């Protein structure tokens, strides 16, 4: 194990000098330094550049407070390695695989795997076309998720990305008994804490491993924490043969951390100040999130859209890797429609008759057609009023408004805030409900009866309670 000494510390960047006759550590190797020689105060550095003359530039995974020039640095001879396997379920980790919940730490001999790996080879990949039922009507009907696919949750600040992720974790664990890995990348510590306790109370935590590198962490940790979560998920897929759900909240923060690291390493910035290696870094992460013949990793990634600008390089680069997109729209939150999923902007390559079936496909496309026509008529309604519409158009507008409200529903994870019990709606029930609305079966019921309910029977029940 080669040993070097700290040459300089500039924020999270640490330069380490090795003797020129020593073997230099490889790129991505983990180096360890002990503050004041105290073995309990370990700081891990990751090699990023080799500068020549035995000097390497590293990025710290923790705060560099207390590091001084001349401190000894040890090369571990391998990349950062994190615990994997069933023991990770119900636990919370940081980027290094250290437990940060209040439970006992992992045994020294626990199985570990490096966070840097190659993507599965082409002949190991599987091409599954099975739908993953989420119980959320707007998703299951209009932008269904593929098992083993990649899903992007797009939206600006405060439109409900994290709540939607929490509901998906809840539904998958309760209804499918599936294993989930939640990776918090550069988001609020408070939200992570709330999520942990909510999942503990509901019992979902026993099926979930959680990895956090939050806003207060150095950029190196925020950049690598997604790989830590992915490594845990890959083990369940490749060794245990499981179908795993990988949640990443937020993939934009991964890009943002990469941009900070790139600037710290002195690279010339590219478009809008992002790192020149943006597409490469995104590709290295996304290509490992895939389904193999042994199991699958279905990833659901929250993607913050800066200033609601979808042409920004960060969300635009992520777009290229996705099978389904769920777009959250601020206009819908202002109308009180939750989840605020835009039914016309959201899309999925799974929405085809071969995958979802002819009836589902026909109902979904007709719903989109009605909503699109309603959007076109809104300008006329705003200027001239409803009276200028033909009877046929008035009927269409009435149905479109009922559909728009029926696409909303209460969430289980939001019950403590809304006081309303959440609902899980099977796909068959969802398709039947929208088909009957399109057929005009519920034209007489008030629009408010369709707001924030589960199945179509709940609409009828709500209308009765309203005295209709």
UniProtKB/Swiss-Prot annotation:
Known SMART domains for this protein?
AAA
Question: InterPro entries recorded for this chain?
Answer: AAA+_ATPase, ATP-synt_VA_C, ATP_synth_F1_bsu, ATPase_a/bsu_AS, ATPase_alpha/beta_chains, ATPase_F1/V1/A1_a/bsu_N, ATPase_F1/V1/A1_a/bsu_N_sf, ATPase_F1/V1/A1_a/bsu_nucl-bd
* Membrane topology summary: Peripheral membrane protein
**Keyword check for Nucleotide-binding:** yes
PROSITE patterns found in the cross-reference section: ATPASE_ALPHA_BETA (PS00152)
One GO cellular component term: proton-transporting ATP synthase complex
Gene Ontology MF annotations: ATP binding; ATP hydrolysis activity; proton-transporting ATP synthase activity, rotational mechanism
Which keywords annotate this record? ATP synthesis, ATP-binding, Cell membrane, CF(1), Hydrogen ion transport, Ion transport, Membrane, Nucleotide-binding, Translocase, Transport
Gene3D superfamilies in UniProt? 2.40.10.170, Bovine Mitochondrial F1-atpase, Atp Synthase Beta Chain, Chain D, domain 3, P-loop containing nucleotide triphosphate hydrolases
Q: What is its main location?
A: membrane
User: Which Pfam families does the protein's record reference?
Assistant: ATP-synt_ab, ATP-synt_ab_N, ATP-synt_VA_C
- The source's superkingdom equals Bacteria
Tell me the subunit arrangement: F-type ATPases have 2 components, CF(1) - the catalytic core - and CF(0) - the membrane proton channel. CF(1) has five subunits: alpha(3), beta(3), gamma(1), delta(1), epsilon(1). CF(0) has three main subunits: a(1), b(2) and c(9-12). The alpha and beta chains form an alternating ring which encloses part of the gamma chain. CF(1) is attached to CF(0) by a central stalk formed by the gamma and epsilon chains, while a peripheral stalk is formed by the delta and b chains.
**HAMAP family documented for this protein:** ATP_synth_beta_bact
Recorded family membership: Belongs to the ATPase alpha/beta chains family.
Q: What does this protein do?
A: Produces ATP from ADP in the presence of a proton gradient across the membrane. The catalytic sites are hosted primarily by the beta subunits.
Protein name (database record) = ATP synthase subunit beta
